[in-house]
Amino acid sequence: MNETVDGEYQAYKARGGKYTRDEFFGKYEQTKKMVASMSDEDISRLNRGGHDPHKVYAAYHQAVNQDNGKPTVILAKTVKGYGMGEAGEGQNITHQQKKMAEDALKEFRDRFEIPIADDKIADAPFYKPEEDSEEMQYLHARRKELGGYLPQRRTEGDKLQIPELSAFDKLLQGSGDREMATTMVFTRILQILTRDKNIKDRIVPIIPDEARTFGMEGMFRSLGIYSPVGQLFVPEDSDQLAFYKEAKDGQILEEGITEAGAISSFIAAATSYSNHGTTMIPFYAFYSMFGFQRVGDFCWAAGDMRARGFMLGGTAGRTTINGEGLQHQDGHSHVMFDCVPNCKAYDPTFSYEMAVIIHRGLVEMYQEQRDVYYYITICLLYTSPSPRDKRQSRMPSSA
């Protein structure tokens, strides 16, 4: 069996017992003798493990009762178009088969012992067991345990008490003569939110490895990086204020260099309001182009699932981080995100813009219960005026 590839197994089912006898069992004299007393029909009816209810039950029973703390994989060998007989069993045409002829339906019925009369078989009716049957009682019990007969989706989460815009007052006042990057502004906003008594436990900062690039390492000490096993080593920067601190109760998800894993965490938190009835506020910060290239399809998936949260595209801009190659040149990420119908894309320049946009997003998603998520680019380094400051902001000498 270990010498046989999947395509051959498919052919054995499609071409019947004689072919299987010659091509599979006939390879070796020992295996040929094993089926010498069996007819071709007997051989064609040899079942695969994935269709054997006893084997499937035994496999799941062993899987759920193992107490070793490890996941269990069940490899089930099955047959394409199982039960269709000559109409499609083991054949590639199964995928295009829209209906079965009456003779094929009768063969299917007889094979699986479905009690449908000959005069009704042409209509291919559904078979429903009696209400007091063991099968129906089992199905009703399972639906009751699952919470009802129809799948349903929560459209509203618990409404959160969002802080007033005045909570960001220092950022609304501008930076005076000091240059301030929008990356730093975002980090300060995140720090304000994680100190707010009403929503601090709902904030989920997510970073795929680039925390220091985005200036977010200052949050390591106060929030900690989540690790299910805690800190297992002494960080080389342990003597510094912003050292790499892991903790079982850490709040930051620093996933390592895996954008796919990080955005999966984002989607899980962003849909928690619907799936679990607990509203979370994820902030997923990544390289706006390098990171986007690895999660583009997930961004659409987030929209399809009505995710709510913030995605932050760091080191944005066409010439920001050229030293690491063309893969980082971002002059179009907003165009890509704008293609997702329920994603709102912004490119703020000044600190007050960043504060207003994020505050508006919090209100829109977590009070008004709108099914949108925000994409905001962060990078620009300017002197930031206040909204009422009519002075022209000075471009930095490095611009």
Roles of regions detected by a PLM:
Residues 1-173:
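Long, well-ordered, tryptophan-enriched scaffold segments
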Residues 92, 391-393:
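A detector of low-complexity, intrinsically disordered, Ser/Thr/Gly/Pro/Ala-rich segments
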Residues 1-3, 384, 397:
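Accessible peptide chain termini
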Residues 111-115, 364, 390:
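Phosphate/oxyanion-binding loops and surfaces in catalytic or ligand/nucleic-acid-binding neighborhoods
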Residues 81-82, 115, 212-213, 319, ...:
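Short, acidic Gly/Pro/Ser/Thr-rich loop/turn segments
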Residues 111, 272, 386:
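Active-site catalytic microenvironments for nucleophilic, acid-base chemistry
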Residues 31-50, 54-58, 124-380, 394-398:
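Thiamine diphosphate
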Residues 382-389:
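Conserved small/polar residues in nucleotide/adenosyl-binding loops
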